[in-house]
A protein has these predicted regions:
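Alpha-helical transmembrane segments of multi-pass small-molecule/ion transporters
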Residues: 1-212
Length: 212
């Protein structure tokens, strides 16, 4: 149940979400993606991993998860970037160029990761049973639908709304598979969900863009 809940509630915001949003909306969407990532990964580290651990070892929240979250390189990078933006500090052009080159690696790395996950599972082993169908329903219909409704209620429009809806329609976060293996939960179910949702994402997003 813990693995199922994590698969339904959190998405792959960076490895798939960032390159997807960048291609769709341009680099101006990056701050919105990073903000979503910060909230998304906070939920993963502080709630999602506890659910998976509860489903596997029978444990729950561990204080070490907070330390792990705060020392994650991506989280540190996001927090530092917020400080730079609010203080108006400009980094040297050479360093900015280096960061841009590193950013350009995200898309090919995401494709490699996606291919590796699908290869590890094997297309013949991908079976859409009832539980996985429910995950797909949450991942690509209910969660984006709720996000759209919340945007309407709170008056969120424009690029911010588009990024939020696309990000919530991203595949199952691959960390679910890693956590399931680490804590003795249903790793096969998590891996199949990650692979199927990644494949489905490339069909769902074009349809979603027509609606947006």
């Amino acid at each position: 149940l813990g693995v199922f809940m994590m698969m339904c509630s959190v998405s792959n915001a960076i490895f798939v979400g960032l390159p997807m949003c960048t291609e769709l909306f341009g680099e101006s969407c990056t701050p919105y993606v990073m903000l979503y990532y910060l909230v998304n990964t906070s939920f993963v580290q502080l709630v999602g991993l506890s659910l998976v651990r509860w489903a596997g070892e029978g444990g729950g929240f561990d204080r070490r998860m907070v330390k792990k979250f705060l020392t994650t390189p991506a989280v540190i990078g996001v927090l530092v970037s917020f400080v730079l933006v609010f203080t108006g500090i400009q980094l040297p052009p050479l360093l900015m160029s280096y960061c841009k080159y590193m950013n350009n690696l995200v898309t090919p790395l995401a494709l490699l990761l996606t291919g590796y996950i699908i290869y590890e599972i094997g297309l013949k082993n991908l079976k859409l049973d009832r539980d996985l169908a429910l995950v797909m329903l949450f991942r690509f219909l209910l969660v984006p639908g709720v996000s759209f409704a919340l945007c309407e209620v709170f008056g969120v429009a424009g690029l911010g709304r588009s990024v939020l809806i696309v990000e919530t329609a991203m595949p199952v976060v691959t960390q679910t598979v890693v956590a399931a293996a680490e804590y003795g939960a249903d790793e096969e179910f998590a891996a199949q969900g990650a692979a199927l949702s990644t494949i489905a994402c490339f069909v769902v997003i074009p349809v979603l863009m027509l609606i947006l």
